[in-house]
């Protein structure tokens, strides 16, 4: 799980830096022209342009990490992946089916909630 966290942090940092570099300079210059300090330039000029992308990227990476956690768990990192792997290895088909349904419902619910959050914030 630490590996997923480190990888996600790196990816989100890179995407955020790319988003900040691609902002429109007009709003920042307008805020600077009013005599705002650097913090106010960031709060009112940069963040409003970057937040929709940051929210979207963060939700995507969260969804991706939930899916990846199952696979990583199957190879020994723990969690529901280990339980699923043990059920598969033990030919416990009812438990395997129940776990698969649980995983599918969880991922589908997260996708639905993520979609709703994107519509609300973006």
Swiss-Prot record:
It is a multi-pass membrane protein. GO terms for biological process: organic phosphonate transport; transmembrane transport. InterPro entries: MetI-like (IPR000515), MetI-like_sf (IPR035906). Its main location: membrane. Keywords: Cell inner membrane, Cell membrane, Membrane, Phosphonate transport, Transmembrane, Transmembrane helix, Transport. It is found in: Cell inner membrane. It holds the Pfam family BPD_transp_1. The chain crosses the membrane at residues 3-23, 39-59, 68-88, 93-113. Residues 1-114 form the ABC transmembrane type-1 domain. Gene3D superfamilies: MetI-like. GO terms for cellular component: plasma membrane. PROSITE patterns: ABC_TM1. Belongs to the binding-protein-dependent transport system permease family. C-terminal fragment of the PhnE protein, part of a phosphonate usage operon that is cryptic in K12 strains. Growth of K12 strains on phosphonate can be observed when it is used as the sole phosphorus source after a 60 hour lag period, suggesting the operon is activated. An intact PhnE in strain B is (AC A0A140NFA3). Part of the binding-protein-dependent transport system for phosphonates; probably responsible for the translocation of the substrate across the membrane. If the reading frame is restored, the complex is composed of two ATP-binding proteins (PhnC), two transmembrane proteins (PhnE) and a solute-binding protein (PhnD). This is Putative cryptic phosphonate transport system permease protein PhnE2. It comes from Escherichia coli (strain K12).
């Amino acid at each position: 799980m630490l590996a997923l966290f480190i990888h996600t942090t790196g990816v989100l940092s890179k995407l955020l830096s790319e988003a900040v570099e691609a902002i429109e300079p007009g709003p920042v210059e307008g805020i600077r022209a009013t005599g705002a300090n650097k913090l106010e330039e960031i709060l009112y000029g940069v963040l409003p342009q970057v937040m929709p992308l940051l929210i979207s990227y963060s939700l995507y990476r969260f969804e991706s990490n939930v899916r990846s956690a199952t696979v990583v768990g199957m190879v020994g990192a723990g969690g529901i992946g280990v339980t699923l792997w043990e059920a598969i290895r033990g030919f416990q088909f009812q438990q395997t089916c129940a776990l698969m349904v649980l995983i599918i419902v969880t991922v589908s619910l997260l996708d639905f909630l993520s979609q709703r959050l994107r519509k609300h914030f973006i």
